[in-house]
Amino acid sequence: MKKTLLTISVLALSAFMLMGCTTAGAESDGTPEAEQAETAQYTLADTAGLLGKADADVADAFGGGEENWTADKSTYIGRIYQTELYGDPVTVYAVCGEEKVMDAVSIWITDGEQEVTDELVQTWQDRVTAFTGAEMEDRGVSGESGTQSWRWNAEDNFYTLRLLEDILTLDINPAVGELK
C-alpha cells in the first residue's frame, strides 16, 4: 500500500512539474507583446536604410547581425541578419566596402529549401513597387544562368528581384554614376 501511494505521489508530482514547464514555455521572455510584434514588422525601408551607414552603427539592426568574414578572416564582408520582413523569415546580407560602410544589401527571401510560388514572386513585386514608387522592368530570363529578374530604378537606389529555381532574392544597391 505504501509503495502504491508513493508511486501515485511521484506520478502526481511529475505531472504538476510538467504542467509547470509547459506554462513556463508559453510565457513571454519579459518583452512586452506590443514590442515583440513591433520588432517583427521590419520592411524594405529598414533594409534600404542600412545603405551608406557605418558597420558599427548597424551592428544591432534587426536584433543584431553576425559578422561575415572571408574563410581566412583576411577580409571583412559585412553582416548577416536572420530576421523577418513583413512577418516572413528572411536572411539579410549587408555588404561593406573598404571603409566598413554598407555598400549593398541582399535579402534572401527563400534559400532553395521551399518552393517559390508565383504568388510569392507577385507579393514581392508588389512590395517593391509600392515601396519605391517606381515602375517594374521585367528583365526576362538570362540565357546563361536561367535567372529571371525584375528591376526598379528608384531615386537613390535600384532594386533587383531575382528568381533561380527555388531561390528568390532582392538586391538593393545605391544608384551611382550613370545609374543616378
Task: Describe each region flagged by the PLM.
Residues 149-171:
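Short, exposed beta-strand-loop hairpins at the edges of beta-sheets
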Residues 22-24:
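Bacterial signal peptide processing site
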Residues 85-147:
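Long, charged/polar, surface-exposed segments that mediate recognition or autoinhibition
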Residues 1-5:
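Positively charged n-region of N-terminal signal peptides that target proteins for export
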Residues 27-60:
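N-terminal low-complexity, Pro/Thr/Ser-rich intrinsically disordered segments
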Residues 6-13:
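Sec-dependent N-terminal signal peptides
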Residues 68, 165-180:
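Short, low-complexity, Pro/Ser/Thr/Gly-rich segments in the mature regions of secreted, periplasmic
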Residues 17-20:
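C-terminal motif of bacterial Sec signal peptides marking the signal peptidase cleavage site
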